Amino acid sequence: VFIMLLPSGYGQAMAAFVAQNYGAKRMDRANKALFYGIITSLCAGVVTGSLAFFYGDILSSIFSSDMSVILASHSYLKAYAVDCIFTAFLFCFLGYYNGCGSTFFVMIQGVIGAIGVRVPAAFLISQLPDVTLFQIGLATPLSSIVQILLCVIMF
């Protein structure tokens, strides 16, 4: 969860900034903020994602000394690391739409992502033979991709 603090913060800041500019009828500034927010959040996502992908075992060892738990959590964190890239886009878009007052859309795309994509994908992937936590974890970035597509369509 701590890996997602940066993109979450970007999303919240985006909502506040966009709301101010939406109210001032300066969507040019709101759109520019979305662009720069995505770029800088993407840079942060690459750094945190790389840490999780390459050093997830060290991060996991903070919480457990059991090597099987560390290896399993590192496997899952590798999939989570992939999502760090996508959440750079997604959370900025969600902040943008929240700032514009499109909260119903934010809710609907979240439900579609979680219930329509992530849960079914995780279930279906978990049914594969010799499945790993990495493979199951890929349901999360898959969901993010669908949610980003919805955000781009809405834009």
Where are the regions that the model predicts?
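Alpha-helical transmembrane segments of multi-pass membrane proteins
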Residues: V1-I3, M67-F93
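Residue-level recognition of transmembrane alpha-helices
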Residues: S41, L77-Y80, C84, G110-V111, ...
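Short membrane-interface helical motifs at transmembrane helix boundaries
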Residues: V47-I70, H74
